[in-house]
Swiss-Prot record:
PANTHER family: ZINC FINGER PROTEIN 839. Residues 329-349, 455-555, 612-654 are annotated as: Disordered. The gene is ZNF839. Residues 501-510 have a biased composition (Polar residues). Residues 476-485 have a biased composition (Basic and acidic residues). PROSITE patterns: ZINC_FINGER_C2H2_2 (PS50157). Keywords: Metal-binding, Zinc, Zinc-finger. This is Zinc finger protein 839.
């Protein structure tokens, strides 16, 4: 049974009344009054009534809860007024006051005790839970209770097993389930925190100011929080979360904003009472009821808090927080009222949090995250001022700013030089210059001046190797021609008689389809000119063009030069062999074998009539063979008419000598006229192992307007013959031959002699259209009578024409 304790105000002695604030048993009042709460019996619930003579009745009820946590309704009982209004003292009720005790218990404690008694009896009436031998509660879920057959209502350890399959042992009380279900949702049985923050517009209530502030934010028309209420709520929240000293100090800070005179100000803020320290140490909860004052303009509302035990936070931290709250309150009191002051007050915590985050952040992360945002709102000058102001607070700004500006100017000048040197004239962006002095200090003016004086030296240099070759060739062509003419007067060396290397033969492999692929050609021996790349374009019916790329990067067309296409047919085991011919400049060319038993095509060039030489002696002929006007036959695949075998049944790979610079003068040549040609191949006796080889060749040429020098500006002799005979101007490489005009019927090599037969039908190369046979011996090239085929019988050469007529020719 509860024993209430009445609290009566009494006048305190002057020795007991402190000058400032007082604190007894954790209860502090910011007034000259002193309240003391003492329970009658510590083991029973206690009720305390607070009253003041000059105020409306105030009451605080403190109760020790039972195991079933629930809210105890409190009854407000007006306290009698005492004649002395100076102070009040709470004294415990003695045993000599039965009337007060009876009245209080009958009015406030009796309904609560009767309610507890009925609940306890109903709980005892419930059946005991069924437990197994291990102590586990054996019961199915409630939603399966009606369908489960074997639900035991007694302990399995004491009872016996049932063999029945019915629901006889299952007993479910519907009314009991309904009562339990109703009790689960009974608000009176739940310990809910009171919602003291209500919206005056929509009647919604919230536990704390945060919910009410969120409600005002979502519904702006309902109103907004009072700044004073926000500050008082912050202060009260910090005090109730701390220890006893923290609560005392924060209550004092709240009292600073209230009127000092208790009689003039009307109602004060409610006093928070708590039970004795023994109850707090046991972890008992304390429910505090707050009363509203009669005059709202002079009071402050504090929400109730549940205190569930002392916090483990250090008192020093809580004291610091409480001091911060006091400073914020004083600052808010000094600020003029209005929404602007409230906005500044709300922004201060966010600034504090941001400052704390910046202190914890690393420098690298700070630069990465904050610098892009800062660069958008801060100018360079403002950043310079801030940087200088941080380090030089007491010094003048300009020397420090000038020092920083010099560093900045140095870096910008370096970047400017890099920009001008890299971009130059190819820059797509325009550089706008507003101050000439700044441009001059950065070096831009000097750069523009140099560009006007030497425009070629500033731009990027991208000279191709082809352009270099053409420029060198054009610049020194005349000089090289004069040097070549002078070298032609030197002694003439005989051609080196060497066999072709295996690598060269392999590199000159033929394509059976008659198409030429571009591939590098290498020199056959020492003293040759650099290797060239020969690319033969696809053959057309009208023209044939060959591109020759020199070793030094120069490119020139070889189509105007002599292009000989040779193909040998092997009659003893081999189908075809790839032959090689070299021009007078020492450049190897291709001679690809065509299809088996087919003729190949060759291209020859003729000199203009006015530049041709006529020699009647063998020595003149041999000298003319070493003249620099010879052109190299370039190989090309192609097929022609097949030639019937004109020799013995065995044959092997031979070599086709070069035929160059045929005489085109549209006149009938005399028997003594000689066309300067030369066999560029190695000696025939080393290549041919049989007496005669029949070779079929066809000549095909491309028009060329004028002379074409080699990659070094002059044409060199073949092999290691460095000296040239003749004049370049007298033996140009120009030629004009059309495809399909001329064919070699047969070429027969006998020892060191070789005979060429040119069929009739050419009125451009040979004006009269007769057949001509050129026989090459060790002494030179001899023009044979027309229309013959050469054969060998010991020392006598028999020349026979295509119709079978023969004429004797002694070697």
């Amino acid at each position: 049974m509860l024993l209430p304790t009445t609290i009566q105000p009494q006048t305190a002695r002057k020795s007991q009344l402190p000058r400032g604030n007082s604190c007894l048993v954790g209860l502090h009042i910011a007034s000259p009054q002193l309240l003391r709460v003492q329970p009658l019996v510590r083991t029973e619930p206690q009720s305390c009534f607070l009253s003041d003579l000059c105020q409306p009745p105030a009451q605080g009820f403190v109760q020790r809860p039972l195991p079933a946590l629930q809210v105890v309704p409190a009854k407000r009982v007006p306290a009698p007024k005492a004649p002395d209004e100076q102070g009040s003292m709470l004294t415990p009720l003695s045993a000599s006051d039965p009337l007060a005790v009876t009245s209080l218990s009958s009015s406030s404690a009796h309904p609560f005790i009767s309610n507890l008694h009925t609940r306890h009896t109903e709980k005892l009436k419930k059946s005991l839970k069924v437990k197994t031998r291990s102590g586990r509660v054996s019961r199915p879920p409630k939603y399966k209770a009606k369908d489960y057959k074997f639900i035991k209502t007694e302990d399995l350890a004491d009872g016996h097993l049932s063999d029945s399959d019915d629901y006889s042992e299952l007993c479910v009380e519907e009314d009991e389930d309904q009562r339990e279900r109703h009790a689960l949702f009974d608000l009176s049985s739940c310990s809910l925190r009171p919602k003291s923050f209500k919206c005056q517009t929509c009647e919604k209530s919230y536990i704390g100011k945060g919910g009410l502030a969120r409600h005002f934010k979502l519904n702006p028309g309902h109103g907004q929080l009072d700044p004073e209420m926000v500050l008082s709520e912050k202060a009260s929240g910090s005090t109730l979360r701390g220890c006893t000293e923290e609560r005392t100090l924060s209550l004092t800070s709240l009292g600073l904003s209230m009127p000092a005179d208790p009689c003039e100000g009307g109602a004060r803020s409610c006093l928070v009472t708590e039970s004795a320290r023994g109850g707090l140490q046991n972890g008992q909860s304390v429910d505090v009821e707050e009363t509203l004052p009669s005059e709202p303009e002079n009071g402050a509302l504090l929400r109730s808090e549940r205190y569930q035990g002392p916090r483990r936070r250090a008192c020093s931290e809580t004291l610091a927080e409480s001091r911060t709250a006091v400073l914020q309150q004083r600052r808010a009191a000094q600020l003029p009222g209005g929404p602007a002051a409230a906005g500044e007050q709300r922004a201060s915590p966010s600034k504090a949090r941001l400052k704390e985050f910046l202190q914890q952040c690393d420098r690298e992360d700070l630069v990465e995250l904050a610098l892009p945002q800062l660069a958008q709102v801060v100018t360079v000058y403002e950043f310079l001022l801030m940087k200088v102001e941080k380090d030089h607070l007491a010094k003048p700004f300009f020397p420090a700013i000038y020092k920083e500006f010099e560093e900045l100017h140095k870096m910008v000048k370096k970047m400017c030089q890099d920009y001008l040197s890299s971009s130059g004239l190819c820059s797509q962006e325009t550089l706008e210059i507003n101050n000439d002095k700044v441009a001059e200090s950065l070096g831009i003016t000097e750069f523009l001046r140099k560009k006007e004086i030497h425009p070629d030296n500033l731009g990027p240099k991208h000279l191709s190797r082809d352009m270099d070759g053409e420029q060198l060739e054009g610049a020194s062509s005349e000089k090289r021609e004069r040097e070549a003419a002078e070298e032609g007067l030197a002694s003439v060396k005989r051609p080196r008689r060497e066999a072709l290397s295996n690598d060269t033969t392999e590199s000159l492999a033929a394509n059976s389809r008659g198409r030429e692929k571009p591939r590098p050609l290498h020199a056959l021996a020492a003293g040759f000119s650099p290797p060239v790349n020969v690319t033969v374009s696809p053959r057309s019916e009208e023209s044939h063009t060959t591109t020759v790329s020199g070793g030094n990067g120069s490119v020139f067309q070889a189509g105007p030069q002599l292009q000989a296409l040779a193909n040998l047919e092997a009659r003893r085991g081999s189908i075809g062999a790839a032959l090689s011919s070299r021009d007078v400049s020492g450049l190897p060319v291709y001679a690809q074998s065509g299809e088996p038993r087919r003729l190949t095509q060759a291209q020859v060039a003729a000199f203009p009539g006015e530049n041709a030489l006529e020699h009647s002696s063998d020595q003149d002929t041999w000298d003319s063979l070493r003249s620099p006007g010879f052109c190299s036959p370039l190989s090309s695949g192609g097929g022609a008419e097949s030639l019937p075998p004109g020799g013995p049944g065995h044959a092997e790979a031979g070599h086709l000598g070069k035929v160059c610079d045929f005489h085109l003068n549209h006149q009938q040549p005399s028997p003594t006229s000689v066309l300067p040609t030369e066999v560029a191949a190695p000696p025939l006796e080393k290549i041919l192992s049989v007496d005669s080889v029949a070779v079929d060749c066809a000549y095909r040429t491309v028009p060329k307007p004028g002379p074409q020098p080699g990659p070094h500006g002059s044409l060199l002799t073949e092999g290691c013959l460095r000296s040239l005979s003749g004049d370049l101007n007298r033996f140009p490489c120009g030629m004009e031959v059309h495809s399909g005009q001329r064919e070699l019927e047969s070429v027969v090599a006998v020892g060191e002699a070789m005979a060429f037969e040119i069929s009739n039908g050419s009125h451009e190369l040979l004006s009269q259209g007769q057949k001509q046979i050129f026989i090459q011996t060790s002494d030179g090239l001899i023009l044979s009578p027309p229309g013959t085929i050469v054969s060998q019988e010991e020392d006598i050469v028999t020349v026979t024409d295509a119709e079978g007529r023969a004429c004797g020719w002694a070697r």
